[in-house]
Regions:
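Short, well-structured N-terminal submotif of metal-dependent ribonuclease cores
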Residues: 1-37, 47-63
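Acidic, PIN/NYN-like endoribonuclease modules and their adjacent C-terminal/linker elements
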Residues: 27, 108-140
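Active-site neighborhoods of divalent-metal-dependent phosphate/nucleic-acid chemistry enzymes
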Residues: 69-117
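Conserved beta-strand segments of alpha/beta enzyme cores
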Residues: 34, 67-69, 131, 136
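Hydrophobic helix-cap positions at the C-terminus of alpha-helices
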Residues: 27-28, 64, 88, 129
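Alpha-helix capping/helix-boundary segments
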Residues: 6, 41, 77, 107, ...
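Active-site-proximal, substrate-binding regions of enzyme catalytic domains
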Residues: 40-88
């Protein structure tokens, strides 16, 4: 399951570093590995692309669901995310500003539902909820 970091890199495929992400995704797909595009990661990336007026990157993002599995947020995901957030707060593990919606707990809830590993640039906070690994560590 893609976190917003790798997803953002996949949409900005023109930069040399980002070609690594494209090659990585292609290798996974060539070996029939299920790759998931969670709605919350789409939201995080999309809002920044809109602000920056990156229409080419938006087109790349829009094309991804034809290649990989798009995962909409469900009510059950939001309930699980609330549970994860509350448990984390009660045990003293910060998940960000309590007044803000936390995308990481929503992403974690989606990954839990699907039994997926999150491919990310930043394992930190996600690892307290679900299996999360650096994208480059997820190999065939």
């Amino acid at each position: 399951m893609l976190d917003s970091g790798p997803l953002g890199r996949l949409t900005h495929a023109d930069y040399s570093r980002n070609r690594e992400y494209r090659a990585w995704l292609a290798a996974l797909l060539d070996h029939n590995i299920a790759v998931f595009l969670p709605e919350i990661a789409d939201y995080e990336v999309r809002r920044n692309l809109i602000v920056e007026n990156l229409t080419g990157s938006l087109a790349n993002l829009d094309a991804l669901p034809s290649l990989i599995n798009y995962v909409p947020i469900t009510t059950a995901d939001m309930h699980k995310a609330a549970e994860l957030w509350a448990t984390s707060r009660k045990t003293g593990r910060s998940v960000g500003d309590p007044r803000e919606l936390n995308a990481d707990v929503i992403l974690a809830a989606q990954a839990i539902r699907l039994g997926a590993t999150i491919a990310t640039d930043n394992v930190g906070q996600l690892a307290q909820f679900v299996e999360a690994r650096p994208w480059s560590a997820i190999q065939l």
